[in-house]
Amino acid sequence: MSNKDICVKISGSKKIREAREKVKSDTLYNLTNAVAQLKSASYVKFDPTLEIVMKLGIDPRHSDQIVRGVVNLPAGTGKTIRVAVICKEEREEEAKSAGADLVGSINIIDEIKAGQINFDVCIATPDMMSMISSVARILGPKGLMPNPKLGTVTLDIKNAIKNAKSGQVEYRAEKAGIIHAGLGKLSFSDQDLLKNLNAFIGAVIKAKPVGLKGNYLKAIYLSSTMGASVQIDLTSIS
């Protein structure tokens, strides 16, 4: 390793250490202060994503305690979303005009079977679900299987594409009741990040299973990609 490489490595380590020292691990933050802290502590050269982790007091193994849904983020995600629409030929032009990146039927199914998944969201009309069932085992684990509860199995192709492109985020509680999602880029204004945070947290709170006993919201953590993590003061959540 050259002297230059050593200097760069030392400099990088110093930046990481200094950035992390700005965040106090034993402090609870409200959302506004948390966003400000994460921005000041970010040291990476790329535009990191603001990430949220929510710990819920549920047991997803029970069917009546599944927490899942979608949220339209007011300020978007900052990502370019590729949308595939599986529909009959007579609706393909409508899907293309609405902004779909990939449109078709059996051609898309064949690509999926071949391992070619070049989309982030898959939308389908109800009459195509029997065909899509043949690739459910491929799409399901990737979170790409169209679902009427998430608005991705619909006759309203135009609106579904609009929602997906404008910043619709899916959430689902995994094992131990953990929800994880990216809610925008750290370069967003504080106001836009707070709008996204409030929309997402509000949606998860509204999704509380009926009849659930005990505390539903156990903990919330915010972090940025490769950055420090801060814990949110739950009493500050309205």
Curated annotation (Swiss-Prot):
Give GO MF terms, alphabetically: rRNA binding; structural constituent of ribosome; tRNA binding
Q: Which Pfam families match?
A: Ribosomal_L1
- Protein name in UniProt: Large ribosomal subunit protein uL1
| One Gene Ontology biological process | translation
Where does it sit, as one GO cellular component term? Answer: large ribosomal subunit
- Role noted for this protein: Binds directly to 23S rRNA. The L1 stalk is quite mobile in the ribosome, and is involved in E site tRNA release. Protein L1 is also a translational repressor protein, it controls the translation of the L11 operon by binding to its mRNA.
Classification via CDD domains: Ribosomal_L1
Determine if ATP-binding is one of this entry's keywords. Answer: no
Quaternary data? Part of the 50S ribosomal subunit.
In the record, the note on similarity to other proteins reads:
Belongs to the universal ribosomal protein uL1 family.
- Write out the entry's keywords from A to Z: Repressor, Ribonucleoprotein, Ribosomal protein, RNA-binding, rRNA-binding, Translation regulation, tRNA-binding
Entries under InterPro entries matching the protein: Ribosom_uL1_bac-type, Ribosomal_uL1, Ribosomal_uL1-like, Ribosomal_uL1/biogenesis, Ribosomal_uL1_3-a/b-sand, Ribosomal_uL1_CS
